[in-house]
């Protein structure tokens, strides 16, 4: 019997949500995703000590630039062991500034290209704020493909699709966390609000012919992953990937094109902001996610500054 990981790979592109090179090499995902929190964790790994030193040197006393150099250096190493793409994130503190997000994204792509890595192997991660989505729209038109993250609401998914972004990362586990805490009960399988969110977005995209890739993210357990088998892509932590690799039970496809999706609806800025405001979970989780990524960005900058 093949493992659930191998079965999942038959109908979903598996992505590793980590900066751990050893785990990536062992689990053989197609793509990999990073974020400020994962980069901070990677900075403590012995294998990245030299990259930290190089980032400090090339950062020229600018902690933000040093962080970008480190992020790109980690991305370079990961790209040596995966066939697909690396997702590298823009500083979360720029989440409400379209122009600054564009400049930072262009800097990241420039650093990759200076290292001899084509932009076709990189996705720029941006928070799914109105300003972030507008930046992504411009980047896509200029040939830079994007991954819109911290996506918790249907309105965010609608706006991303209309902007023509390459890929979205709707979060499962953080939605689950909010409802579990708010309602004081557990959720399993298709009853999980996080699973329901991704399923609804997937069906909407397929029913309306959107090319944007749906990549479920932020998983708390195997049940959530299994309930989304068939999603375009799933980005999964090494711990859960290992559990899938060790489980030889049967895994069936749950999502497939052809389901009943809602009619297309285009949101202007006012409608987007109102819909997000009406969704207490998404409003709270988006704000929290930006704060957490910003905090870890600051910690990474402090770590690099201390080594200068």
UniProtKB/Swiss-Prot annotation:
UniProt-annotated location(s): Cytoplasm
Keywords (A to Z) from UniProt: Cytoplasm, Pentose shunt, Schiff base, Transferase
Subcellular location, principal: cytoplasm
Pathway in which the depicted protein is active: Carbohydrate degradation; pentose phosphate pathway; D-glyceraldehyde 3-phosphate and beta-D-fructose 6-phosphate from D-ribose 5-phosphate and D-xylulose 5-phosphate (non-oxidative stage): step 2/3
Top-level lineage group: Bacteria
InterPro entries the record matches: Aldolase_TIM (IPR013785), TAL/FSA (IPR001585), Transaldolase_1 (IPR004730), Transaldolase_AS (IPR018225)
Keyword Acyltransferase listed: no
Catalytic residue list: 125
GO cellular component: cytosol
EC number(s) per entry: 2.2.1.2
Keyword Cytoplasm: yes
Reactions catalysed: D-sedoheptulose 7-phosphate + D-glyceraldehyde 3-phosphate = D-erythrose 4-phosphate + beta-D-fructose 6-phosphate
Record-annotated disulphide pairs: none
One of the GO biological process terms: carbohydrate metabolic process
Any one GO MF annotation of this record: transaldolase activity
NCBIfam families assigned to the protein according to its UniProt record, in alphabetical order: PRK12346.1 (NF009001), talAB (TIGR00874)
PANTHER family given in the database record: TRANSALDOLASE
Subunit structure, as described in the record: Homodimer.
Similarity field: Belongs to the transaldolase family. Type 1 subfamily.
The protein's role, per its UniProt record: Transaldolase is important for the balance of metabolites in the pentose-phosphate pathway.
Name the record gives this protein: Transaldolase
């Amino acid at each position: 019997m093949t493992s659930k990981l191998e079965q999942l790979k038959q109908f979903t592109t598996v992505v590793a949500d980590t900066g751990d090179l050893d785990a990536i090499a062992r689990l053989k995902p197609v793509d990999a995703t990073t974020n400020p929190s994962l980069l901070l964790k990677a900075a403590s790994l012995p294998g990245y000590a030299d990259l930290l030193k190089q980032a400090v040197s090339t950062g020229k006393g600018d902690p933000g630039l040093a962080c970008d150099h480190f992020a790109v250096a980690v991305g370079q190493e990961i790209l040596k062991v995966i066939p697909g793409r690396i997702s590298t994130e823009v500083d979360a503190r720029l989440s409400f500034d379209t122009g600054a997000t564009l400049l930072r994204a262009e800097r990241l792509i420039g650093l990759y290209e200076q290292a001899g890595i084509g932009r076709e192997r990189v996705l720029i991660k941006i928070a799914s704020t109105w300003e972030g989505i507008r930046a992504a729209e411009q980047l896509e038109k200029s040939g830079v493909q994007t991954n819109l993250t911290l996506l918790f609401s249907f309105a965010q998914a609608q706006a991303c699709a209309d902007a023509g972004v390459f890929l979205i990362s709707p979060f499962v586990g953080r939605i689950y966390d909010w409802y579990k805490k708010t309602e004081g009960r557990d959720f399993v399988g298709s009853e999980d609000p996080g699973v329901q969110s991704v399923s609804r977005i997937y069906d909407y995209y397929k029913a309306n012919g959107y090319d944007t890739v749906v990549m479920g993210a932020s998983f708390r357990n195997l049940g959530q992953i299994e309930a989304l088998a068939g999603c375009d892509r799933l980005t999964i932590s090494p711990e859960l990937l290992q559990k899938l690799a060790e489980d030889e039970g049967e895994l069936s496809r749950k999502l497939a094109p052809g389901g009943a999706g809602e009619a297309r609806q285009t949101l202007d800025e006012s409608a987007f902001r109102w819909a997000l405001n009406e969704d207490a979970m998404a409003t709270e989780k988006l704000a929290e996610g930006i704060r957490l990524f910003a905090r870890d960005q600051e910690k990474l900058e402090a770590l690099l500054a201390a080594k200068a």
